[in-house]
Amino acid sequence: MWKQVEFELQSRRRGFHLITGEILRNLPPLPKVGLLHLFIKHTSAGLSINENADPDVRVDMESIFNHLVKEREPYYQHTLEGDDDMPAHAKSSIIGTSITIPITNGKLNLGTWQGIYLCEFRDYGGNRRVVATISGE
């Protein structure tokens, strides 16, 4: 069995945002066993799985990525879309645009402290589109 849905996430400011609930609300019923693949259709945002309990983790992740990839570097050629755009492309490539999660007994088989993150790398990224592909039985 294969299912695929595409949906829009609400607009968020730059940062790492826990979106597990929003993802689940947009999915059709899940099979008993299978895989959920999520793909974000943008080049300046990403998806990740990380801690869902302490919000300081999300703040720290933002700080780490801003330290790794700085804005306004003199060697950036792609600068027409703002100071945050080229760094957003680099951060998206580092973190990735897709994740895969196992489905067990009709539920996402995430660890106790795991949640799905939208990694928004633009100051004002706008609405983001996600393709969810479900396989299983």
Kindly give the residue locations of the regions a language model identified:
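Active-site histidine-anchored catalytic micro-motif
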Residues: 1-137
